[in-house]
Amino acid sequence: LDPWDHIESAMGLDVMGFEVESKKAYNWLRTYQEKDGSWPSIFYSTEQNKLKETNFSSYIAVGMWHYYTNFNDKDFLYEFWPVLDAAIEFTLTAQTEHGDFFWAKDDKNWLDDSLKTGCSSIYMSLFCYKKIAKEINKQDRVSDIQLKNLKECLRRKSFRFDRNWES
């Protein structure tokens, strides 16, 4: 199980109208969020995994926006804002001068590669984060320049992605 799949499952619960169960999924994420705003890449695995993936952390924004659009529960956005804001702060620390985001961090360092799929997911996550911030009148820590730089990197700097393996 990873945080991204967990959020996808919560969105499936949203579509089916399982509001209480979906909210429990977000409570689970809140419980296991690391102090730096991230989540481990894998839960319930026999292998020790200390990676923290940026697109996994930021994806909670997409899930929260999905929950809100399904249930129109603004209190949910307020309640989980600190979780979301911390996750986005973690992700933003991984943006490079090219606009892409390092895909993961180990115990100490960012891994020097970016994934096109991961950065595409981050783009949507940052977009949803901005919508949530506006909806509940919270400080938005994502600048339009950061989004523009990511979009331009995705469109024009393919050399930035998947550098450590063939995709």
Role assignments for model-derived ranges:
Residues 2-96, 119, 123:
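Aromatic-rich carbohydrate-recognition surfaces in CAZymes
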Residues 1, 40, 95-104, 111-167:
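Catalytic cores of carbohydrate-active enzymes
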Residues 36, 107-108:
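A general structural signal for short secondary-structure boundary/capping elements
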Residues 47-48, 109-113:
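Surface loop/turn signatures of beta-propeller and other carbohydrate-active proteins
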